[in-house]
Design a protein with these regions (language model features):
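Short helix-loop-helix connector
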Residues: 88, 183-184
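Re-entrant/interfacial helical elements at transmembrane boundaries that shape
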Residues: 7, 101, 176-182
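Membrane-interface alpha-helices at helix entry/exit sites of multi-pass transporters
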Residues: 93-99, 185-198
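Hydrophobic, well-ordered secondary-structure elements that form the walls
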Residues: 92, 179, 218-222
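Short, Lys/Arg-enriched, Gly/Pro-containing loop segments at transmembrane-helix junctions
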Residues: 121-125, 245-255
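Hydrophobic alpha-helical segments of multi-pass membrane transport proteins
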Residues: 15-26, 107-117, 158-178, 197-201, ...
């Protein structure tokens, strides 16, 4: 637990520093305008976008965004639910919902605005042209190009690369811990079990990337396919989850 905790705290500090540098020394007014307008557009169009179907949206959009990310979230749900439940022990239902359902999405939208908004700003100002990179799905090239255009240049790109690497490490560690807990049947699985599942996930990802010749297309398809049976497993939580949360809230004197 201490390893995950140290990495997570370091990552939070590094993310705050990077975000502060981008906002203060970058196009501050533009980023502020983008965030306010984007949030207004998002809230105003939430239901129409959430219920969009292939009849009103291009097939490629539904495939690469709606379907893929629905499957992505479904695939992550069981492991993240187990992990969040474990680290939330001792906290109230209200505190957990506040952290997971409110604060985390707000932090995510701010981070997307800082990086994505900076990319849009430099694209519009002619600093670079990401059209070819995005059309060919070279997201790594686009990300590094945007990072090098941020305040700090190469140093900022290196910091973002480090941040991303640690995020992947903490996510993998959390997932292996969740799988080990389920497999062991208790909250304190042996370290070798966590190492085994971490290695198994890394090996599977490497195999899928190798099959896709270094591209993430095969990995994305695998996520979508495996999310189908997982969705059946988590389906009962749609009605058992609220009842469990309500029961806990009553026990904690919140309702």
């Amino acid at each position: 637990h201490r390893g995950i905790q140290l990495l997570s705290r370091f990552n939070v500090i590094l993310a705050l520093v990077i975000a502060g540098v981008i906002f203060v020394f970058g196009p501050t007014l533009f980023l502020t305008d983008v965030y306010v307008q984007s949030m207004g557009q998002y809230l105003g169009s939430f239901f129409s976008m959430a219920t969009m179907t292939a009849q009103t949206a291009p097939d490629w959009w539904m495939k690469w965004w709606t379907v893929f990310f629905f499957a992505w979230f479904i695939g992550y749900t069981p492991l993240m639910a187990v992990f969040v439940s474990r680290i939330s022990r001792g906290r109230t239902v209200r505190e957990t919902i506040m952290a997971v359902a409110i604060l985390a999405p707000i932090a995510t939208t701010i981070w997307f605005t800082l990086l994505g908004g900076s990319g849009i700003y430099h694209q519009l100002s002619g600093t670079f042209d990401l059209t070819d990179a995005l059309n060919s799905f070279q997201f790594d090239v686009a990300t590094l190009t945007v990072a090098q255009a941020l305040p700090g240049g190469t140093w900022m790109a290196a910091a973002i690369l480090l941040l991303t690497t640690i995020f992947v490490a903490t996510t993998g560690d959390s997932m292996s811990y969740s799988i080990a807990m389920v497999g062991a049947g208790h909250d304190e699985p042996q370290p070798w079990i966590r190492v085994f599942w971490g290695g198994a996930m890394a090996l599977m990802a490497a195999i899928l990337l190798y099959m896709g010749a270094g591209q993430i297309g095969v990995l994305q398809q695998f996520i979508v396919i495996t999310a189908i049976p997982v969705s059946l497993i988590i389906l009962p939580s749609l009605w058992t989850g609220p009842r469990a949360a309500s029961a806990l809230a009553k026990e904690q004197g919140l309702t």
